[in-house]
Structure formats: structure tokens, C-alpha cells
């Protein structure tokens, strides 16, 4: 929703990337989520305290908590698929199917399942499957930029949605864009930060 995009990064970043969003289910029910890109965990009490403070800033004080949940999502480009064999094939999060830049797993998994089925139908060895497409490299550079941003990474997210049609951004995150569309997205943010990360990877032979 508009509120999700506009307000998500208004919270204190605390030298990380932290954002809050409200996903309404009806006129009086909603999911309120506090998310961090972090290399360390925080106490549950801090999560709840930050959510309460956020709601108070929005003048939301009369509410009932119906349920609570939490989760940890590995945001990594580690090539789990390189450990696969023709008879042993990891899937889901264990197989590296969680999209590194967003944490999306379900949509990503459906696409990868289609690829696996195609290999099986053609009797091709599963060990030959590699998920290193251009989007994998985009995610790799994106994570580099986030790690090196020292708390300013939220600007990358904000610029993406502020300077582009949200539909195109979600299409990009679903890995359905053309290279031409991707180029226009890259040029809408501080592209030099990604270029520097790319050259650093090339110089270190780590790409």
C-alpha cells in the first residue's frame, strides 16, 4: 500500500537497515511488521518496543494484539546449489532458494521447481543446474552495497520506489524484467555504489 512504501524507513536505522510496515486485512485488522537487515539478533522486547513506538507515532493507541510471530531469513548469495548431485538435491531455503535481496522464498521456489521439472522431463542431470543468472549477480552486488552502507542502505530501497513505478520494481524483484527495464532501474539510484562493488569483486576474483 501507499503507507507501506511511504513510512517503512521512517524508523531509527541504528546503523543498519530497519523498516516497519502495516499490511491491513480489513478496516480494523492488520499485520504490523518490524524488519531488520542485520548480522546480529536483537531481543524480542526491542522488537515489540519499536512496534509500539511506531504505532504511537501514528496515533494508534487503542488496539488488541491477536497474535505474534517472528522469523529469521538468511540473506545470502552462498551457492548452495554447487553441493547438489544427481541423487541429492537441496530445495527451499536449504537449497538457497530464498531471494537474497528480499527474503522472498515461495515465488522464487515455484520458478525453480519449473526448472527442475524441465530437467527431469528431458532426463538431464540435476547436478548441472545452476541458479547463477544475472539476477543472482544483482543480488550479490546489492548485498555488498547494503553491508558497506553503514546504515544508509535504506536510501537504496527508498530511491527504488520513489523514482520508479512500483509495479516495475515488483516485476524486477520477481526477476521478470528485461535488461532494458533493469538498466532504467539501475540509473534511478546511485549507480556508482554498485559499480564500485562490481569492480571490487572483479579485483578480488570473487564474482
Model-derived features: positions:
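Short, small-residue-biased leader/transition segments that mark boundaries at the very start
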Residues: 2-5
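A short, hydrophobic, proline-anchored segment that marks a local hinge/packing element in signaling
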Residues: 23-26
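A basic- and aromatic-enriched beta-loop-alpha substructure that forms the phosphate/nucleotide-
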Residues: 33
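Short, surface-exposed coil-to-beta transition loops
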Residues: 16-19
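FAD/FMN-dependent oxidoreductases across multiple families
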Residues: 12-14, 38-115
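Hydrophobic residues embedded in beta-strands of well-ordered beta-sheets
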Residues: 29-30
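C-terminal helical "tail/cap" subdomain of flavin- and related membrane-associated enzymes
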Residues: 114-207
Amino acid at each position: 500500500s501507499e503507507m507501506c512504501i511511504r513510512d517503512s524507513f521512517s524508523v531509527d536505522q541504528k546503523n543498519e537497515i530497519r523498516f516497519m510496515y502495516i499490511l491491513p486485512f480489513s478496516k480494523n485488522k492488520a499485520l504490523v511488521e518490524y524488519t531488520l537487515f542485520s548480522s546480529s539478533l536483537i531481543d524480542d522486547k526491542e522488537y515489540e518496543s519499536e512496534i509500539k513506538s511506531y504505532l504511537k507515532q501514528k496515533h494508534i493507541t487503542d488496539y488488541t494484539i491477536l497474535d505474534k510471530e517472528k522469523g529469521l531469513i538468511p540473506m545470502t548469495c552462498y551457492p548452495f546449489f554447487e553441493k547438489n548431485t544427481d541423487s541429492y538435491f537441496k530445495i527451499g531455503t536449504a537449497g538457497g532458494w530464498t531471494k537474497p535481496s528480499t527474503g522472498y522464498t515461495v515465488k522464487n521456489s515455484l520458478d525453480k521447481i519449473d526448472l527442475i521439472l524441465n530437467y527431469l522431463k528431458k532426463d538431464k542431470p540435476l547436478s548441472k543446474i545452476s541458479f547463477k543468472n544475472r539476477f543472482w549477480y544483482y543480488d550479490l552486488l546489492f548485498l555488498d552495497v547494503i553491508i558497506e552502507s553503514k546504515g544508509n542502505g535504506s536510501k537504496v530501497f527508498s530511491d527504488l520506489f520513489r523514482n520508479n513505478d512500483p509495479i516495475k520494481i515488483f516485476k524486477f524483484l520477481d526477476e521478470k524484467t528485461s535488461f532494458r527495464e533493469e538498466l532504467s532501474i539501475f540509473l534511478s539510484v546511485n549507480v556508482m555504489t554498485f559499480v564500485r562493488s562490481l569492480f571490487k569483486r572483479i579485483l578480488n576474483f570473487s564474482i
